[in-house]
A protein has these predicted regions:
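NAD(P)H cofactor-binding loop motif with strongest signal on the N-terminal glycine-rich segment
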Residues: 10-11, 82
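C-terminal hydrophobic helical "lid"/dimerization subdomain
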Residues: 138-190
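Rossmann-fold NAD(P)-dependent oxidoreductase module
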Residues: 18-22
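Short helix-loop-beta connector
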Residues: 1-5, 72-73
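Glycine-rich phosphate-binding loop and adjacent beta-alpha segment
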Residues: 34, 85-156, 190
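Adenosine-nucleotide cofactor-binding segment
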Residues: 24-86, 137
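N-terminal Rossmann-like NAD(P) cofactor-binding module of classical short-chain dehydrogenase/reductase
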Residues: 7, 76-79, 101
Length: 190
């Protein structure tokens, strides 16, 4: 909702940069995390109002930094594509009745969750969406892609392709992704 705050991990990556743009277009204050100082400007250019460099495993420090941006109140929603390394920080930075959208495993799968802990942390919600639960039919797929391409056509979303590799260099592309050296989308060319 307009006026709310959201946390987006990997805000300079392919999915993160699109998500930041979409949220900002809807009037959401977007707090992004990136893996290095070199990625801060990329995240800002895609709609983040504040960018935090998260280069270590300090979950408590990251959660405190996110809460400080929101004057101590946390965020209403956290989008976590990283997984194991950021999952606890994502939960800890949510305000009461906040939502964690866990959709990636870049650092490994998220740890098991004690459901009872959600009540002690403020009646939190956690979801693990998969694409085909949202576009289960051809009609749903066409409707979703129509909205997506309209947003690109209308300039709401810019698709940043910052890396291109020949298909024969796929191993190098994977190495760069795993080393957190990329921004925006990465494309393999046959």
């Amino acid at each position: 909702d307009a006026g709310s705050r959201a946390l987006v991990h990997a805000a300079a990556g392919g999915t993160g940069s699109l998500l930041c743009q979409w949220l900002a277009w809807h009037g959401v204050e977007v707090i992004g995390t990136v893996g290095s100082e070199a990625k801060v400007d990329v995240a800002l250019a895609h709609g983040c109002t504040k960018v935090l460099v998260d280069a270590d495993d300090d979950a408590a420090g990251l959660a405190a930094a996110v809460r400080a941006v929101g004057s101590g109140g946390g965020v209403q929603v956290a989008y976590d594509s990283i997984g194991r390394r950021t999952f606890s920080a994502s939960l800890a930075c949510l305000e009461r009745r906040g939502l964690l959208v866990s959709f990636g495993n870049a650092s490994g799968p998220p740890p098991p969750l004690d459901v009872l802990s959600l009540s002690t942390q403020g009646s939190l919600f956690v979801t693990r969406p998969t694409l085909f639960d949202y576009v289960a039919t051809r009609a749903e797929l066409l409707a979703a892609t129509t909205r997506l391409f309209a947003a690109i056509r209308d300039g709401i979303l810019r698709v940043p392709v910052h890396q291109r590799w020949p298909l024969r260099d796929a191993a190098e592309a994977h190495r760069a992704l795993e080393a957190r050296e990329t921004t925006g989308a990465s494309v393999l060319i046959p």
